A protein has these predicted regions:
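Short, low-complexity N-terminal intrinsically disordered segments enriched in polar/charged residues
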Residues: 16-50, 54, 156-160
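Solvent-exposed loop/turn segments at secondary-structure junctions
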Residues: 63-65, 104-107, 144-148
Length: 160
């Protein structure tokens, strides 16, 4: 009977996966929040790499992007929307993942993303899922509605 109890305890530990300490969850959430609030919202792009692993990969739209490519995309975004604001609406952590529901807004006053400046404002909601390793963001998946962005900027064909 004792062996059965030990076996059941071991099986439960294996099935439930790795246990992540509450302080690790809180620390990962804080890194994610700081990335959104300090780097993206306040435009401190020079601090971008402080929260990311050197071999970070972004799996968002299109092909996977390296840290350098993701940082270049953020610079291009900030160029196109220099007054961009980013707000963290909700943040959840489980295991080695942190999910952030966010809102971004800004005015398109300069060319960027291969599009002309429109002078129009844009607002959008999105979700980003981060995977952490050793306290740094290792991977990222972001989703948002690009159609809505193009529509708000007046860059979609109108019905004729």
């Amino acid at each position: 009977m004792r062996h059965l109890a030990l076996f059941m305890l071991a099986a439960t530990a294996i099935i439930s996966g790795p246990v992540v300490a509450k302080d690790t969850l809180a620390r990962n959430k804080e890194v994610a929040r700081s990335f959104f609030e300090d780097v993206l919202d306040k435009g401190k792009l020079e601090d971008y790499a402080k929260s990311h692993a050197p071999d970070f990969i972004a799996h968002s739209e299109g092909q996977p992007a390296s840290l350098e490519e993701d940082m270049a995309a953020a610079r291009e975004q900030r160029k196109a929307l220099p007054d961009m604001r980013v707000k963290v609406n909700h943040i959840v952590a489980e295991g080695d993942h942190v999910s952030v529901y966010w809102t971004a807004s800004g005015t398109n006053t300069a060319a960027g993303w291969g599009m002309p400046a429109t002078g129009k404002s844009v607002s959008l909601n999105g979700m980003t899922l981060f995977r952490f390793e050793r306290g740094l963001i290792q991977e990222e998946w972001s989703v948002f509605n690009m159609y809505s962005i193009l529509k708000q900027l007046g860059l979609l064909p109108t019905k004729g």
